[in-house]
Protein backbone atom coordinates (compact mmCIF):
# COMPACT_ATOMS: atom_id res chain seq x y z
CA UNK A 1 0.00 0.00 0.00
CA UNK A 2 3.03 2.25 -0.30
CA UNK A 3 2.79 2.55 -4.06
CA UNK A 4 1.38 5.72 -5.57
CA UNK A 5 -1.12 3.55 -7.42
CA UNK A 6 -1.53 0.31 -5.46
CA UNK A 7 -2.60 -2.83 -7.28
CA UNK A 8 -6.43 -2.61 -7.31
CA UNK A 9 -6.81 -6.22 -6.18
CA UNK A 10 -4.50 -5.65 -3.22
CA UNK A 11 -6.24 -2.41 -2.28
CA UNK A 12 -9.65 -4.11 -2.46
CA UNK A 13 -8.43 -7.05 -0.37
CA UNK A 14 -6.96 -4.77 2.32
CA UNK A 15 -10.18 -2.76 2.43
CA UNK A 16 -12.17 -5.95 3.13
CA UNK A 17 -9.99 -6.89 6.11
CA UNK A 18 -10.69 -5.79 9.66
CA UNK A 19 -7.74 -3.69 10.83
CA UNK A 20 -7.24 -5.83 13.94
CA UNK A 21 -6.57 -8.88 11.73
CA UNK A 22 -3.63 -7.28 9.92
CA UNK A 23 -0.11 -7.49 11.37
CA UNK A 24 3.37 -6.64 10.17
CA UNK A 25 6.71 -8.04 11.29
CA UNK A 26 9.60 -5.83 12.35
CA UNK A 27 11.49 -7.78 9.68
CA UNK A 28 9.11 -6.46 7.03
CA UNK A 29 9.64 -2.96 8.39
CA UNK A 30 13.37 -3.51 7.94
CA UNK A 31 12.86 -4.75 4.39
CA UNK A 32 10.81 -1.66 3.56
CA UNK A 33 13.53 0.57 4.98
CA UNK A 34 16.23 -1.29 3.04
CA UNK A 35 14.28 -0.81 -0.18
CA UNK A 36 14.03 2.92 0.45
CA UNK A 37 17.75 3.11 1.20
CA UNK A 38 18.46 1.74 -2.27
CA UNK A 39 16.65 4.68 -3.92
CA UNK A 40 18.57 7.78 -4.97
CA UNK A 41 19.32 9.75 -1.82
CA UNK A 42 17.80 13.03 -2.94
CA UNK A 43 14.77 11.65 -4.79
CA UNK A 44 11.33 12.92 -3.86
CA UNK A 45 10.03 9.33 -3.92
CA UNK A 46 12.61 8.31 -1.31
CA UNK A 47 11.58 11.17 0.97
CA UNK A 48 7.90 10.28 0.50
CA UNK A 49 8.48 6.59 1.28
CA UNK A 50 10.67 7.39 4.30
CA UNK A 51 7.86 9.51 5.69
CA UNK A 52 5.32 6.75 5.10
CA UNK A 53 7.50 4.07 6.71
CA UNK A 54 8.27 6.19 9.76
CA UNK A 55 4.83 7.75 10.24
CA UNK A 56 2.00 6.08 8.34
CA UNK A 57 2.91 2.39 8.59
CA UNK A 58 3.30 2.51 12.41
CA UNK A 59 0.00 4.43 12.59
CA UNK A 60 -1.77 1.89 10.36
CA UNK A 61 -0.53 -1.06 12.41
CA UNK A 62 -0.26 0.64 15.82
CA UNK A 63 0.18 -2.20 18.34
CA UNK A 64 0.23 -4.88 15.62
CA UNK A 65 3.92 -4.68 14.69
CA UNK A 66 5.30 -8.06 15.73
CA UNK A 67 8.81 -8.38 17.19
CA UNK A 68 11.22 -11.26 16.70
CA UNK A 69 11.12 -13.12 20.01
CA UNK A 70 13.27 -15.99 21.23
CA UNK A 71 10.51 -18.45 20.22
CA UNK A 72 10.39 -16.96 16.72
CA UNK A 73 14.18 -17.10 16.42
CA UNK A 74 14.12 -20.76 17.45
CA UNK A 75 11.41 -21.53 14.87
CA UNK A 76 13.47 -19.76 12.22
CA UNK A 77 16.55 -21.77 13.21
CA UNK A 78 14.69 -25.04 12.58
CA UNK A 79 13.14 -23.81 9.31
CA UNK A 80 16.48 -22.53 8.05
CA UNK A 81 18.35 -25.67 9.06
CA UNK A 82 15.80 -27.94 7.41
CA UNK A 83 15.90 -25.92 4.20
CA UNK A 84 19.71 -25.94 4.12
CA UNK A 85 19.81 -29.71 4.69
CA UNK A 86 17.36 -30.11 1.80
CA UNK A 87 19.64 -28.02 -0.43
CA UNK A 88 17.12 -25.19 -0.65
CA UNK A 89 18.50 -22.31 1.42
CA UNK A 90 16.16 -19.40 2.04
CA UNK A 91 16.43 -15.69 2.57
CA UNK A 92 16.83 -14.90 6.28
CA UNK A 93 14.08 -12.26 6.19
CA UNK A 94 11.61 -14.68 4.59
CA UNK A 95 12.47 -17.29 7.21
CA UNK A 96 11.93 -14.84 10.06
CA UNK A 97 8.60 -13.71 8.57
CA UNK A 98 7.50 -17.34 8.15
CA UNK A 99 8.54 -18.15 11.74
CA UNK A 100 6.61 -15.11 13.01
CA UNK A 101 3.49 -16.19 11.12
CA UNK A 102 3.79 -19.74 12.46
CA UNK A 103 4.30 -18.52 16.03
CA UNK A 104 1.20 -16.30 15.87
CA UNK A 105 -0.89 -18.60 13.61
CA UNK A 106 -1.08 -15.96 10.88
CA UNK A 107 -1.14 -16.06 7.09
CA UNK A 108 1.73 -14.47 5.17
CA UNK A 109 0.33 -12.11 2.55
CA UNK A 110 2.89 -11.69 -0.22
CA UNK A 111 3.39 -11.60 -3.93
CA UNK A 112 6.31 -14.02 -3.51
CA UNK A 113 4.31 -17.12 -2.59
CA UNK A 114 7.02 -19.48 -3.88
CA UNK A 115 9.52 -18.13 -1.34
CA UNK A 116 7.39 -19.59 1.46
CA UNK A 117 6.62 -22.95 -0.15
CA UNK A 118 7.32 -25.95 2.04
CA UNK A 119 7.68 -23.96 5.26
CA UNK A 120 4.34 -25.01 6.72
CA UNK A 121 3.01 -21.47 6.82
CA UNK A 122 -0.28 -20.35 5.25
CA UNK A 123 0.39 -17.98 2.35
CA UNK A 124 -1.94 -15.79 0.30
CA UNK A 125 -1.34 -13.46 -2.64
CA UNK A 126 -4.01 -10.83 -3.30
CA UNK A 127 -2.15 -9.79 -6.47
CA UNK A 128 -4.36 -10.92 -9.28
CA UNK A 129 -7.06 -12.10 -6.85
CA UNK A 130 -10.58 -10.76 -6.96
Where are the regions a protein language model picked out?
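Residue-level signal for short amphipathic helical patches enriched in basic/charged
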Residues: 5, 60, 111
Amino acid sequence: MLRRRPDPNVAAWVKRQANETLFVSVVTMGELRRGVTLLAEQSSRRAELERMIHEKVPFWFQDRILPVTLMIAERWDVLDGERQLAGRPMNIADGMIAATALEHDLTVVTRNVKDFAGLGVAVFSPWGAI
